[in-house]
Amino acid sequence: MANTHSAKKATRKITRRTAVNKSRRTLMRGSVRIVEEAIAKGDRDAAIQAMKRAEPELMRAGQQNIVHKNSASRKVSRLTHRIAKLAK
């Protein structure tokens, strides 16, 4: 249990930030899942549209340290590559 005033405040702050980060992480994962489902169905147009919504979410999560920025970039790259393979 936090004893000092500043430690109590830090605990409240951590709780708020955790809630925000969980929400953003859930949004990011959901958008990625939609892209992956479209790829699994083989629906290239739906995958492209979903990717247009997912890429900004991933990059924003990387900028805000919800995930590491390289992880976000890697995820975007791999999804884009998989969508490109659908055209062939």
UniProtKB/Swiss-Prot annotation:
PANTHER family: 30S RIBOSOMAL PROTEIN S20, SMALL RIBOSOMAL SUBUNIT PROTEIN BS20C. The gene is rpsT. One of its GO terms (molecular function) is structural constituent of ribosome. It comes from the Bacteria. This is Small ribosomal subunit protein bS20. GO terms for cellular component: cytosol; small ribosomal subunit. The lineage of its organism: Bacteria, Pseudomonadati, Pseudomonadota, Alphaproteobacteria, Hyphomicrobiales. Binds directly to 16S ribosomal RNA. It comes from Nitrobacter hamburgensis (strain DSM 10229 / NCIMB 13809 / X14). The keyword RNA-binding applies. Belongs to the bacterial ribosomal protein bS20 family. InterPro entries: Ribosomal_bS20, Ribosomal_bS20_sf. Residues 1-20 are annotated as: Disordered.
